[in-house]
């Protein structure tokens, strides 16, 4: 007898092949049979008439490292069909790190990951994994190379000594041994922004020819995005490793329509020469990260205390104004998005809370300040722990990336403890189905499902996931594509998506018509499992 039988639905198996009618049988958390199973007995039967049956969706780029410990974790994810997520992205992982720079690291992670119980930030992934509560969905972890560097040398040093590299190498190897799925880079963030290309290659040398995925938030995603792709291809060639470029985009109207075709062409040529290169994209024209990210890399030298001193110094602020007006050598988000395109979504001091949800331009007008002075004063007041949403990308570029066979879908969901998160936390996967499939026809339903299942699974070597095939994990969604709906907005983002009839995690029903199961069937995914 089967544990579970899903009958009467249209199967979209994740491979991109045309949809077909079939039943699916589940036994022991695995897919046991696909076909006409009308004669089979099952302990539980699910009628999928009028619905499609797909693999569970996989988001390999979230920042839920600390959110996993929140009592309501999983609802936002399951409601949009997610059965697997991966954290530790952009070089920013909650582990591993020790005591020497713990306070600095926790402060730096705060706008991205939210409030962190120091007991959950551990020196080893082998300690972090057992500390996790029961999980409602499967969770994997990348080890953040930025966290490794900060643990070895803090945020103050721009150039490392051999002893620092030795510590980074040892910690990286240990994290991979403990089960990290790969390594993530955040070259747009301190302290990794201080690496030269050759220093970066040396820091990553334990990965050489090991077939371990490297994901990267590139050094620049605006006017320098093509050069940044070139840099990462240099790294991939030098180390002979699989490269996955995170949230590919071209920030700033001046770069729309030109930079992304060039970047995709570079990736396609690299793929043709034999490199294992892929990328991902989120389906929104706005991103979300630390407000600190508007500053040029050299302004970040010395760590947060040094940054605050510079922000308070009139001469340094004048120099910053000149850098932002010129926009040379860094992702000048203030210029690329405009002060009216940068919204404050995570503020924590009571006197600043009235500005929550306002743009920098709006706050500047309310306070009678110049926008840059307003921004700098807020950063000082909040000790740089501010989250923003910045509107800077082109929907046409997003469509170009989605059409590429190299791309998969991600959310880049951040989890600030207060304020208004980006609606992508709650709605990325329904947004793709609703907007880019149903409304705009950028992708077929089969193509979209592949970008949410098999392609992300392949990028991070999740061999038992991403498709409906006998022997693979029974992570399965049942839904009517016409009913899938993203309910959240930028003004009111914290709303669960609608339309998932069933979400099945490891053969266990986790969600049925908006009702969440009390069972926790999620597992911790480790490299090599």
Task: State the predicted function of each range.
Residues 166, 174-234:
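Divalent metal-binding pocket/active-site signature
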Residues 1-41, 462, 483-491:
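N-terminal metal-binding scaffold of metallo-dependent hydrolase/deaminase domains
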Residues 9, 313, 400-406, 411-412, ...:
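C-terminal cap of metal-dependent C-N hydrolases
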Residues 9, 24, 29, 50, ...:
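Divalent metal-coordination and catalytic microenvironments
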Residues 66-142, 161-178, 201-209:
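Alpha-helical scaffold segments that flank or form the walls of functional sites
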Residues 372-379, 445-453, 468, 472:
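Short, well-structured alpha-helical segments that form the helix of a local strand-helix-strand
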Residues 128-162, 168-189, 204, 237, ...:
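Active-site neighborhoods of metal-dependent hydrolases
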């Amino acid at each position: 007898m089967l544990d579970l039988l899903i009958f009467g639905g249209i199967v979209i198996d994740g491979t991109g092949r045309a949809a077909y009618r079939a039943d699916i049988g589940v036994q022991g958390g695995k897919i046991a049979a696909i076909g006409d199973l009308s004669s089979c007995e099952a302990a539980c039967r699910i009628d999928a008439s009028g619905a499609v049956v797909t693999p569970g969706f996989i988001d390999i780029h979230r920042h839920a490292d600390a959110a996993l410990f929140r009592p309501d974790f999983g609802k936002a994810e399951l409601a949009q069909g997610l059965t697997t997520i991966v954290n530790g992205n952009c070089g920013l992982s909650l582990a591993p790190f020790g005591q020497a720079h713990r306070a600095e690291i926790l402060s730096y992670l705060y706008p991205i990951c939210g409030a962190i119980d120091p007991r959950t930030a551990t020196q080893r992934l082998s300690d972090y994994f057992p500390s996790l509560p029961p999980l409602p969905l499967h969770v994997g972890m990348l080890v953040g190379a930025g966290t490794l560097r900060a643990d070895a040398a803090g945020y103050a040093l721009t150039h490392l000594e051999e002893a620092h590299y030795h510590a980074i190498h040892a910690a990286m190897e240990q994290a991979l041994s403990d089960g990290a799925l790969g390594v993530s880079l955040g070259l747009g963030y301190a302290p990794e922004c201080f690496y030269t290309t050759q220093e970066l290659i040396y820091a990553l040398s334990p990965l050489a020819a090991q077939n371990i995925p490297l994901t990267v938030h590139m050094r620049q995603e605006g006017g320098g995005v093509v050069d940044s792709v070139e840099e990462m291809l240099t790294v991939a060639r030098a180390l002979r490793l699989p490269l996955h470029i995170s949230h590919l985009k071209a920030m700033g109207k001046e770069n729309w329509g030109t930079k992304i075709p060039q970047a995709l062409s570079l990736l396609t040529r690299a793929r043709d020469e034999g490199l294992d290169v892929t990328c991902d994209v989120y389906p929104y024209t706005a991103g979300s990260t630390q407000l600190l990210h508007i500053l040029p890399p050299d302004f970040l030298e010395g760590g947060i205390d040094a940054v605050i001193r510079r922000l308070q110094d009139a001469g340094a602020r004048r120099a910053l104004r000149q850098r932002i007006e010129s926009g040379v050598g860094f992702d000048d988000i203030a210029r690329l998005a405009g002060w009216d395109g940068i919204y404050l979504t995570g503020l924590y001091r009571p006197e600043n809370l009235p500005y929550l949800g306002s743009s920098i331009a709006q706050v500047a007008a309310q306070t009678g300040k110049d926008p840059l002075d307003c921004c700098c004063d807020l950063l000082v007041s909040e000790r740089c722990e501010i989250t923003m949403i910045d509107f800077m990308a082109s929907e046409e570029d997003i469509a170009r990336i989605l059409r590429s066979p190299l791309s998969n879908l991600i959310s880049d969901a951040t989890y600030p403890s207060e304020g208004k998160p980006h609606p992508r936390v709650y709605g990325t996967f329904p947004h793709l189905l609703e907007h880019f499939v149903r409304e705009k026809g950028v992708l077929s339903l089969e193509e979209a499902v592949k970008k949410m299942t098999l392609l992300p699974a392949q990028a991070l070597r999740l061999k038992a996931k991403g498709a409906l095939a006998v022997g693979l994990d029974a992570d399965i969604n049942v839904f009517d594509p016409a009913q899938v709906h993203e309910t959240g907005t930028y003004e009111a983002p914290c709303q669960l998506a609608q339309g998932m009839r069933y979400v099945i995690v490891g053969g266990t029903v986790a969600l049925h018509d908006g009702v969440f199961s009390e069972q926790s069937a999620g597992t911790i995914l480790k490299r090599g499992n």
